[in-house]
């Protein structure tokens, strides 16, 4: 979510939670430079994930080498932009940011209600593509440096693996 990063260690055989931790211990910072704007620093997500993971491992006394799989759940519709070196170019525009709604409304009008509601199941006003259109128009110097865009969970996966990819459900977020 946008308020903290949570790590849980689950026994795959029993399905029981062995340990769980979250960081930061107070609500995560949301940067709101203007009304309707909401951004977070993706690097803070990564740092908080490392802290939460360390706490879970310490509490459970499980050796990290014994962990067989990692699952990632995350806030939707956040836009993370990275350069060719996988460095974050700007704070992520997160799900509750509404600055790009006019871009989404234009897409809704261009694509048509039928397409949007039957394929997207929603108006694209708050979707990732609308946020990217906002950056293109309002921050062209950032836009020119973008190598890849991703969702918050994809950023964490990139930090864990070094690979930039997404999921089928991530692709559906528009």
Regions found by a protein language model. Give the residues of each.
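N-terminal glycine/serine-rich phosphate-binding loop of ATP-dependent small-molecule kinases
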Residues: 1-90, 102, 106, 118, ...
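Gly/Ser/Thr-rich active-site cleft segment
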Residues: 2, 115-174
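Structural signal for hydrophobic packing residues in well-ordered secondary-structure cores
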Residues: 13, 53, 57-61, 108-112, ...
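Carbohydrate-associated surface elements
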Residues: 97
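Flexible glycine-/small-residue-enriched beta->alpha junction loops
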Residues: 104-110, 154
């Amino acid at each position: 979510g946008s308020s903290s990063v949570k790590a849980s260690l689950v026994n795959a055989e029993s399905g029981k939670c062995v340990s769980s931790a979250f960081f930061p211990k107070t609500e995560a910072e949301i940067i709101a430079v203007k009304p309707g704007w909401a951004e977070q620093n993706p690097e803070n997500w990564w740092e908080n994930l490392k802290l939460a993971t360390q706490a879970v491992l310490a509490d459970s006394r499980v050796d990290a080498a014994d962990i067989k799989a990692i699952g990632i759940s995350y806030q939707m519709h956040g836009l993370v932009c990275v350069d060719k070196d996988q460095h974050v170019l700007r704070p992520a525009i997160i799900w509750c940011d509404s600055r790009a709604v006019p871009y989404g409304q234009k897409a809704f009008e261009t694509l048509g209600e039928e397409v949007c509601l039957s394929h997207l199941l929603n108006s694209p006003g708050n979707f990732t593509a609308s946020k990217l259109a906002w950056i293109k128009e309002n921050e062209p110097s950032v836009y020119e440096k973008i190598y890849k865009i991703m969702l918050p969970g994809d950023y964490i996966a990139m930090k864990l693996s070094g690979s930039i990819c997404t999921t089928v459900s991530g692709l559906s977020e528009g």
